[in-house]
Swiss-Prot record:
Residues annotated as binding ATP: 45, 52-54, 94, 99
Protein name listed in UniProt: Succinate--CoA ligase [ADP-forming] subunit beta
Biological-process GO terms, alphabetical: succinyl-CoA metabolic process; tricarboxylic acid cycle
Pathway assignment: Carbohydrate metabolism; tricarboxylic acid cycle; succinate from succinyl-CoA (ligase route): step 1/1
Domain of life: Archaea
Residues bound to Mg(2+): 193, 207
A Pfam family matched in the record: Ligase_CoA
NCBIfam families reported in the protein's UniProt record: PRK00696.1, sucCoAbeta
Subunit structure as annotated in this protein's UniProt entry: Heterotetramer of two alpha and two beta subunits.
Species annotation: Pyrobaculum aerophilum (strain ATCC 51768 / DSM 7523 / JCM 9630 / CIP 104966 / NBRC 100827 / IM2)
EC number: 6.2.1.5
GO MF assignments: ATP binding; magnesium ion binding; succinate-CoA ligase (ADP-forming) activity; succinate-CoA ligase (GDP-forming) activity
Gene designation: sucC
Domain ATP-grasp: 9-240
Length: 382
C-alpha cells in the first residue's frame, strides 16, 4: 500500500518529526480556506501515489490564497500518469538552505534493512546514482540487533551535520523515526526526498513516502480502512478483484487473461506477448477454483471496457475443468450476452465434461496453449 504524502507525513509527525503546517483539500473552496489559515505563500501538492508529480504539473506554489484557489481549479481532475487528482495537500512554503536524500528500504539479498543517504537531494535516487554515485552512502541494519547509535552517527555525519549541534540532533531523530516507522508499520520503503535544512536552520522532511507491505495490512486496520475509502493507485477492477479474493493486476493491453496459478498465468501472458498481443491483466483464480470463482473472474473481464478477447488457460489438478466451464457458462448468462470472444485451453480433471459444456455454448476449446494464445491475439486484432 502506497501512502499519500500527507499520510506519510502524519506518520513522521506521530514519531516526533516536525513537518511544515498543511492540510488536505477536496475542493477549491477548501484550498482557499486552508491557504488563509496557514498563510501564503503555500504549496499545492497533488495527492497521487506516483513519482514525478512536479514535472507533470502536480506541484504549484501560490503567493496568495486567491492564487491558490485559481491554481487548484486547474489541478483538481488532472491526469498524472493515469491517476486522477482528487486531493490536494496545501502546505506552508518553506525556504530551503540545502536539500538531502534519505530513505530506508529492505535489501532482500542481504536480508537486512538498508539506509540510503546522500547530501544531494531533490531528485530521484536513480538520478543521483547515475550522476553522483560517490555521494550515496549505504548503511545496513540487521533486524536482529536493530538500529544502533553508530548507524545513526554514520548516516547523519554523511549528510553533513556536525555532532553536538541542534541540527545533528534533529537529523538523528529523523533517522530513528524512519526506522521505527519501517518496523512498526511493516513498511517496504520509508523515504524523505528532499530532507531539507530551512533558512531558519531546522531539519525537516519536505516530502515523505511510505510503502506498507500489503500482506501486513491486517495488522493495521486504520490503513486498511484508508485503502478501502481511497484505492489510490488501485483501479476499480483491481479493487473489486481483491474484494472477491483474486490475484489481479491491471495492465494496458486488450487480451484478458485468466489462469490458475501464478506461474501458468504469467506463462500465458508471455505467450500472448510472443504472438504479438498485449495482455490487459494478470488474473490468477488459484487452485481448486469453484464455478462461482470462475464466474466472477470472467464477469470482471466481460465488463472491462478495454478487453476484446478473454483467454482462459487452465490446468486441472484440483481445479476441475467442468467447474471452470460451468463458471464461464454462468458468467455469459448473467451478463446477458456479449460481443467479446472467449478462448479456452483446459487440460486435466474432468476435461471431457468441460469440453461438452463449452461446446453447448459455442466457446472454442484448444488442446494447445500456443494455439489458443495465437487465436486470442488474432481475434483481438479484428
Amino acid at each position: 500500500m502506497k501512502l499519500h504524502e500527507y499520510e506519510a507525513k502524519e506518520l513522521f509527525s506521530k514519531y516526533g518529526v516536525k513537518i511544515p503546517p498543511g492540510k488536505v483539500a477536496l475542493t477549491p473552496e477548501e484550498v482557499l480556506k486552508i491557504a488563509r489559515e496557514i498563510g501564503a505563500p503555500v504549496v499545492l501538492k497533488a495527492q497521487v501515489v506516483v513519482a514525478g508529480r512536479g514535472k507533470a504539473g502536480g506541484i504549484k506554489v501560490a503567493n496568495s490564497p486567491e492564487e491558490a484557489y485559481e491554481l487548484s481549479k486547474r489541478m483538481f481532475g488532472m491526469n498524472i500518469k493515469g491517476l486522477i487528482v482528487k486531493k490536494l495537500y496545501v502546505t506552508k512554503f518553506v525556504e530551503v538552505e540545502r536539500e538531502m536524500y534519505l530513505s530506508l528500504i529492505i535489501d532482500r539479498a542481504s536480508r537486512r534493512y538498508l539506509f540510503l543517504a546522500s547530501p544531494v537531494g531533490g531528485m530521484d535516487i536513480e538520478e543521483i546514482a547515475k550522476t553522483s554515485p560517490e555521494k550515496i552512502k549505504r548503511v545496513y541494519v540487521d533486524p536482529a540487533t536493530g538500529l544502533r547509535d553508530y548507524h545513526v552517527r554514520s548516516i547523519v555525519s554523511w549528510l553533513g551535520f556536525k555532532q553536538g549541534t541542534s541540527q545533528w540532533q534533529q537529523a538523528a531523530s529523523i533517522v530513528q523515526a524512519m526506522y521505527r516507522i519501517m518496523v512498526d508499520y511493516d513498511a517496504e520503503l520509508v523515504e524523505s526526498n528532499p530532507l531539507a535544512v530551512t533558512k531558519e536552520g531546522e531539519v525537516i522532511p519536505l516530502d515523505a513516502r511510505v510503502i506498507v507491505d500489503d500482506n501486513a495490512l491486517f495488522k493495521h486496520p486504520e490503513l486498511e480502512k484508508a485503502l478501502e475509502e481511497d484505492p489510490r493507485d488501485v483501479t476499480e477492477f483491481e479493487a473489486y478483484a481483491k474484494k472477491i479474493g483474486f490475484h489481479y493486476v491491471e495492465l494496458d493491453g486488450d487480451v484478458g487473461i485468466i489462469g490458475n496459478g501464478a506461474g501458468l498465468t504469467m506463462a500465458t501472458m508471455d505467450l500472448v506477448y510472443h504472438f504479438g498481443g498485449r495482455p490487459a491483466n494478470f488474473l490468477d483464480i488459484g487452485g481448486g477454483a469453484s464455478r462461482e470463482v470462475v464466474k466472477e473472474a470472467v464477469k470482471v473481464l466481460l465488463h472491462h471496457p478495454r478487453v476484446k478477447v478473454i483467454f482462459v488457460n487452465i490446468f486441472g489438478g484440483i481445479t476441475r475443468a467442468d467447474e471452470v466451464a460451468l463458471g464461464i457458462k454462468e458468467a455469459l448468462a448473467e451478463s446477458g450476452g456479449t460481443n467479446k470472444k472467449i478462448v479456452v485451453r483446459m487440460k486435466g480433471t474432468n476435461e471431457e465434461l468441460g469440453r461438452a459444456i463449452l461446446a453447448e455454448i459455442g466457446v472454442p476449446l484448444f488442446d494447445s496453449a500456443e494455439e489458443a494464445a495465437k487465436k486470442a491475439v488474432e481475434l483481438a486484432r479484428v
